[in-house]
Regions:
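Non-catalytic accessory segments flanking enzyme active sites
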Residues: 60-153, 164, 253-283, 288-307, ...
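A conserved hydrophobic secondary-structure block that centers on an alpha-helix together
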Residues: 134-197, 203
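Beta-propeller blade signature
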Residues: 125-126, 176-180, 224-234, 280-284, ...
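Cap/lid segment of the alpha/beta-hydrolase catalytic domain
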Residues: 139-155, 165-170, 184, 419-425, ...
Length: 708
């Protein structure tokens, strides 16, 4: 189980009344980017790739290019007169105590806490007498705060803990084991762990996942064969036992293990892509027992939730696109023997085992609905939530009679509630001391029609009394992929934005998981254009309803959302004033050749699949659709030099292409964070700096000369 607190990224908008104008009257004199003669051939079609050399993250030439681009970008940003004022505002508002939902391990209650501006949140604990102490402080792991804490997993009795750390934002992790009572390190540090959970087998050892060390650069070389290992405490990592994966017949990119609470069964999930998995069962009490196949198809997702003796419970979308909870006996765990415990409904379901109950977390139009069931599948109660928004948490051991959950939305700072599992009685456990009154703001859910008539939900959040005059600076944020659901969460910067009259809008695009597998699939492969059409239609809705106008509309997204921004800013440049693609997947013909990129083929397809797939990808790939003679929105591309999820070469090449072909005076800049990765674990100080730059850039290019 992962317990984390990641402060939300901050974004700032400021209302302005004057007519916006071009803040950059002079043509930009960008650093020169060398072009070479690299050409690839796909199904007889030649595709030039003149910036291929920027893919070499270890070359001196690439390092010099990064230095020159950063100097140019920071020089531009430093001249914006209110950039420092925005940073100070962010720091002031960020500086409040944040706490995560508590959880019990052994004789202690643990929780994450950030005193305000700490670079990384700290894991604290209290004993039964209420005495508080620091358990793990990642701020001590490095001088600059760039080493972060990842997975933290306790053994079932809470006496041992294994945790993973990331350096410089990398997906590669190191693993450390502690005696939880004394905090003494046990054994050696494990290395080369990636995309891994930790599953304890009693107090003897644990299962974890990794790839072989890649040939070439660790930051960009392809990683393909995921493997599950067992580490026995007190033995060197080189002696770890390979449990699953690594053979020619088992070419899985994502392998993970889960152990039942009674340490009787090991469940192995194996996947080729980010959607769909096979599930296997191993009897840990019988070393000679064969590996049992539970599901043997990659067309659905199935995961182990809990067991009651020999009765196993699984969450699955097999023959149930919105999800259901099923049970089966360990002797016959295959789908043909499954029995529904909580059947599929029209709303998307995810399940947690909490105490001696199941908590069903439904998404109703991308908003939380929580129901409590017993192990017979009988409804106990629906949990009453404070408002519309997002509820999380609901962790509890079998021996516990209460649980904690968090609640938040775009205008509601996260609060923690304590719930009695037997009676359902709920009380406020913790409330942040932040000078923000949610009653002054409104989150409104609207539904608009996309290009093909599909109804798409969107949350629009703003200060009550806003004027619908088309002059409100507006940030339209999107993702639309990988079955990821965008549910309402609070951020300090959005609060500032709304205080000053700004609008924050988040549509739930196809490709996400808001309406189950069918909604996800409708935004994948040769239906990816649906995602872009949904986002463009959201922009049109905001403009038509007078929330904003093209001169006051900025768009932002990260990772797959960076692809969304890159594609839509090229397809409809006249709709947007500012574009902010972050750590984006921007070269759709080569994305699958880097690190874990091949695992994204379920959503994208690859240029090697077929001529038709190649042509489709080429038709929207941001890198390959920049045209001369077009004035694109003012663009600030952001990436990290240690991003080994979506390698920075995507952003490097896209920036070079845009700078070479941009017409007009809207700037094309790239901001490359050093010693930083894909985003998770980014220090608070770096996050504030980046958001100050993003918002200063946005406002300056909307024509704002000074802050109100």
């Amino acid at each position: 189980m992962i317990h984390k607190l990641f402060p939300a990224a901050l974004l700032l908008l400021v209302a302005c009344n004057q007519t916006p104008n071009n803040a950059n009257s002079e043509k930009m004199n960008y650093p020169q980017t060398r072009m070479d003669n690299t050409v690839d051939t796909y199904f007889g079609t030649q595709i030039a790739d003149p910036y291929r050399w920027l893919e070499d993250d270890r070359s001196a030439e690439t390092a010099e290019w990064v230095k020159q681009q950063n100097n140019f970008t920071f020089g531009y940003l430093s001249k914006i007169p209110y950039r420092q004022a925005i940073k100070e505002k962010l720091e002031k508002l960020w500086n409040y105590e944040k706490i995560g939902a508590p959880f019990t391990e052994g004789d202690y209650t643990y929780y994450y806490k950030n005193n305000g501006l700490q670079n990384q949140s700290v894991l604290y604990r209290k004993d039964k007498d209420g005495k508080e102490e620091v358990f793990l402080d990642p701020n001590t792991f490095s001088k600059d705060g760039t080493t972060s804490l990842g997975e933290v997993a306790f053994s079932e009795d809470g006496s041992l803990v294994a945790y993973l750390i990331s350096e410089g934002g990398s997906d590669w992790r190191k693993g450390i084991v502690l005696n939880a009572k004394t905090k003494e390190v046990i054994g050696d540090t494990l290395i080369d762990i990636k995309f891994s959970s930790i599953a304890w087998k009693g107090n003897e050892g644990f299962f974890y996942s990794s790839y072989d060390k890649p040939k070439g650069s660790e930051l960009s070389a392809k990683t393909d064969q995921h493997k599950l290992y067992y580490h026995k405490l007190g033995t060197p990592q080189k002696n770890d036992q390979l449990i699953f994966g690594g053979t020619p017949a088992e070419k899985y990119r994502y392998v993970s293990g889960a152990v039942s609470l009674d340490a009787h069964y090991l469940f192995i999930s194996a996947a080729v892509n980010t959607s769909g998995n096979k599930l296997f069962l191993k009897d840990l009490k019988n070393p000679k027992a064969p590996l049992v196949t539970i599901t043997n198809s990659l067309d659905a997702d199935t995961q182990f939730i809990d067991n009651d003796g020999t009765t196993l419970f699984f969450e699955t979308n097999l023959n149930a696109p919105n999800g259901r909870l099923v049970k089966a006996e360990v002797a016959k765990p295959q789908p043909e023997y499954w029995q529904d415990v909580i059947p599929e409904t029209k709303n998307v379901l995810s399940i947690s085992a909490t105490g001696n109950y199941f908590f069903a977390r439904y998404m109703v139009d991308a908003l939380s609905q929580i129901k409590q069931y017993n192990y017979k599948g009988e409804l106990v109660r629906e949990v009453k939530l404070p408002s519309i928004g997002t509820a999380g948490g609901f962790y509890a051991k079998k021996s516990e009679n209460h649980t904690y959950f968090t609640f938040t939305n775009y205008a509601y700072p996260a609060q923690i509630y304590k719930m009695d599992l037997a009676t359902g009685a709920t009380e406020l456990y913790w409330k942040p001391a932040i000078a923000f009154d949610a009653n002054n703001y409104e989150s409104k859910q609207v539904f608009y029609n996309s290009k093909d008539g599909t109804k798409v939900p969107m949350m629009i959040t703003y200060k009550k009394g806003i004027k619908l005059n088309g002059k409100n600076p507006t940030l339209l944020y999107g993702y639309g992929g990988f079955n990821v659901s965008l549910m309402p969460t609070f951020s300090v910067a959005n609060a500032v934005w709304m205080e000053l009259g700004g609008v924050y809008a988040v549509p739930n695009l196809r490709g996400g998981g808001e309406y189950g597998k069918q909604w996800h699939d409708a935004g994948t492969e040769m239906q990816k254009q649906n995602v872009f059409d949904d986002f463009i239609a959201a922009a049109k809705y905001l403009i038509n309803q007078k929330y904003t106008s093209p001169e006051y509309l900025a768009i932002k997204g990260g990772s797959n959302g960076g692809l969304l921004i890159g594609a839509t800013m090229l397809q409809r440049p006249e709709l947007f004033k500012v574009a902010l693609p972050a750590v984006g997947v921007l070269d759709m013909l080569r994305y699958h050749t880097f690190t874990a990129g091949a695992g994204w083929a379920y959503d994208y397809g690859t240029a090697d699949d077929s001529k038709e797939m190649f042509e489709y990808l080429k038709g929207y790939s941001p890198l390959h659709n920049v045209k001369k003679g077009v004035s694109y929105p003012a663009t600030l591309i952001t990436t990290g030099d240690h991003d080994d999820r979506v390698v920075p070469a995507h952003s490097f090449k896209f920036a070079a292409e845009l700078q070479a072909k941009q017409t007009g005076n809207n700037p094309i800049l790239i901001r490359i964070e050093t010693n930083a990765g894909h985003g998770a674990g980014t220090p608070v100080s770096k996050t504030i700096e980046q958001n100050a730059d993003l918002q200063a850039f946005t406002l300056w290019n909307m024509g704002v000369k000074k802050l109100n």
